[in-house]
Amino acid sequence: MSIVFALSAISKSFGKNNQVNIIINANLQIKKGEIVALIGPSGSGKSTLLHIAGLLDTPSSGSVFINNIECSATTSDREKTYLRRNFLGFVYQFHHLLQEFSVLENVMLPQIIIGKSNEVARKNAIELLSLVKLQDKLLMSISQLSGGERQRVAIARSLINYPSIILADEPTGSLDNDTALEVFSLLHKYAKEKNISVFLATHNHILAKKADKIVQINSGTLQNYTDY
């Protein structure tokens, strides 16, 4: 199976003279359609690594490869924006949905941004909202939804441009266990059906065990996790 995403010798340091090492020489390959869970204690560098993976933060050294396109500290903001919009999907613990927009408009927005017509964007958004079982709430405002429903909207939005990989940073962290499992199951099912890769940072070991592979970060070091 082809590699669609890779981290190569990623390091990240902060502070005067880069004295504080957050990520130390992280290497990872994710195959097409593979779901990889990232676990580790609070403050271990999970979110920092996800932000670097999503081209939202710049590593001190090393490269990110997305569909064999290399991104490093010298990659332009314009190229990073292109890659984010066309190959990456994002789901966060705090969804960043637009409160003044309807459910349907929130999911349509990424397609409008890349130049799709309203008709095409609407059709694709309705299809995905049906997938996450929100077809009867298309015109509702975000404020009218429960926490679990909002995360389902966020998942639909992350899928709308058919990304190569979804980066999910604690996507169910604010939900109760039953709702978290329901939301993650929807993401897992669609990713497997469409052969989309997922890189998931989570504290929830029940969700992590549903991944194809688990990696652990501790004190900035990334390693395979085999203690199922």
Curated annotation (Swiss-Prot):
It comes from the Bacteria. It is an enzyme of class 7 (translocase). Gene3D superfamilies: P-loop containing nucleotide triphosphate hydrolases. ATP binds at G40, P41, S42, G43, S44, G45, K46, S47. InterPro entries: AAA+_ATPase (IPR003593), ABC_transporter-like_ATP-bd (IPR003439), ABC_transporter-like_CS (IPR017871), MacB-like_ATP-bd (IPR017911), P-loop_NTPase (IPR027417). CDD domains: ABC_MJ0796_LolCDE_FtsE. Keywords: ATP-binding, Cell inner membrane, Cell membrane, Membrane, Nucleotide-binding, Translocase, Transport. Its EC number is 7.6.2.-. Residues 5-228 form the ABC transporter domain. PANTHER family: ALPHA-D-RIBOSE 1-METHYLPHOSPHONATE 5-TRIPHOSPHATE SYNTHASE SUBUNIT PHNL, LIPOPROTEIN-RELEASING SYSTEM ATP-BINDING PROTEIN LOLD. Belongs to the ABC transporter superfamily. Lipoprotein translocase (TC 3.A.1.125) family. This is Lipoprotein-releasing system ATP-binding protein LolD. The lineage of its organism: Bacteria, Pseudomonadati, Pseudomonadota, Alphaproteobacteria, Rickettsiales.
